[in-house]
Amino acid sequence: DVCAERILDELRAAGRPVTVVRGNCDSNSEWPLVVDVARGGLRFRLEHIPPDVPPDDVDVVLHGHTHVPRNEKRGGVLFLNPGCVTRPNQGAPASVAWLEIANGKIKWRLVDL
């Protein structure tokens, strides 16, 4: 969830491209619920609420919603969640993640704050 559009403005001010999907706490109905992108030979799906069934047309699902970090492979699809900075759940620490893609490989590093 972005929640406040000023947060999005701050992210954009960092000078890097920003892709947003709408979360359950976001009021901007213009933001898409799902975005598919290809990077480094991999197909990614960005969506706030993770699907119950692994999609068959992507390699990686990047999601939020649970506020719990996740790095789990299901049905050949890698599910990644960086956790949450402001309101982590289930005893998880506040966290962010770094995602690097090179030669069709993913390097995922969770960073506790």
Positions of predicted regions on the chain:
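Active-site neighborhood of phospho(di)ester-bond hydrolases with catalytic His/Asp-centered motifs
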Residues: 1, 19-24, 45-48, 60-65, ...
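Core catalytic region of metal-dependent phosphoesterases/phosphodiesterases
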Residues: 1-40
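Binuclear metal-dependent phosphoesterase catalytic core
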Residues: 36-40, 56-57, 73-75, 80-113
